[in-house]
Swiss-Prot record:
Main location: membrane
Quaternary structure (record): NDH-1 is composed of 14 different subunits. Subunits NuoA, H, J, K, L, M, N constitute the membrane sector of the complex.
Membrane topology: Multi-pass membrane protein
Enzyme class: translocase
PANTHER family: NADH-QUINONE OXIDOREDUCTASE SUBUNIT A (PTHR11058:SF21), NADH-UBIQUINONE OXIDOREDUCTASE CHAIN 3 (PTHR11058)
Keywords for this protein: Cell inner membrane, Cell membrane, Membrane, NAD, Quinone, Translocase, Transmembrane, Transmembrane helix, Transport, Ubiquinone
Source organism of the structure: Acidiphilium cryptum (strain JF-5)
Native organism taxonomy: Bacteria, Pseudomonadati, Pseudomonadota, Alphaproteobacteria, Acetobacterales
Record keyword NAD present: yes
Compartment(s) of residence: Cell inner membrane
Protein name: NADH-quinone oxidoreductase subunit A
Superkingdom field: Bacteria
InterPro entries to which the protein is assigned, alphabetical: NAD(P)H_OxRDtase_bac/plastid, NADH_UbQ/plastoQ_OxRdtase_su3, NDAH_ubi_oxred_su3_sf
Amino acid sequence: MADNAHYWVLLVYTFVVIALVAGMIGVSHFLGQRHLKRATIEPFESGIVTVGYARFRLPVQFYLIAMFFVIFDLEAAYLYAWATAVHAAGWTGYLVIAVFILALLAALAYLWRAGALEWGPKPRALAIVRRR
């Protein structure tokens, strides 16, 4: 009987979440605006009239920096998990995390050497332009 209690709690929780989401969507549908004029379609940003088109392509460097952040942020989570259990891990855990940190440093050195962290023009391209 005690094992089934966990399933009932999960079922009730799922039902409550679905009912809450459906209720929020329903209330916003019934209370929301029904007309689509030019003034209601445009975004309102601190009373400033919008200028230009907001959907433009970002340079690829933004994508690369975001990917590097996600990758190195996950490693920070692993390091935090190791730091909370450092006494239980012992010397074996210390050696494993040392290898892990060395792999991180090698990856960072590779990215730095490959120029993935550079935002400006490539130095090689600048040298070619200066020779002309």
